[in-house]
Amino acid sequence: MTAKQSLKYQLLAAQCGFAFEILYAIFWGYFGHNLPPASPNLSAPDLASFFAQHHNAILFGNCMAALVGILWVPWTAQLSVVMWRIEGSSPVLTIIEVIGGALTAWALMFCPAIWAVAAFRPDADPNIIRTLNDLGFILFNITYAITSVQAIAAGLAGLADKGSSPVFPRWVSYWAIFTGLSFLPITAMPFFKTGPLAWNGAITFWGLFGTYFVWTASMGVYMAKDASRRLREESEVHAPRQLKEALARSR
């Protein structure tokens, strides 16, 4: 593979972060009726009624969310390429980031599958539907550390970039670290069925998903800019040679 081809793939991988954010918000958030999610304080019959009322939308949304969750993988891969370039021969932060990213992708795909199971049979026992819904949200949230280590490792690597043109502005790296640490309140989420720390609350849902999406978007923007710049430079290097070859063939 040529350097130019590799850089094209890197640019595409960086842009997968934007596609993930948009598509996951549409499928899991809008179609899955998770903007915000149903209250954890709902009774089993009320939750079963909610799932039955929105049966097709919830099933479709979560099936599609399980699919588009894979977009986290190429975005993570490109972030690891950038970090490895920064770290050099001992890329411990890169390894932490790529493992955290792989596990995050698993959660982004596996948890919607659980909600799809909950929606699969509208006539199922309401207690089973509620248990599956609980499993999905608790698993989705309290495994936050896999994403925290990814964000923190990326932020630390960004701050360690001593090149003349760092890939990430310092505020982006600090925001990544802040994002990873901001998930800590989720540890208390299972103890609350109402209020800001419930899974549909102001902190646990709106606040933390907000920091997460800003982190993904900001790092994605600068990764795409970096790949575009390197691709442009690679094209400029080869342009004179390609011109000479074209002139030689025309003679």
Regions found by a protein language model. Give the residues of each.
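Hydrophobic, aromatic-enriched alpha-helical segments typical of multi-pass transmembrane helices
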Residues: 1-251
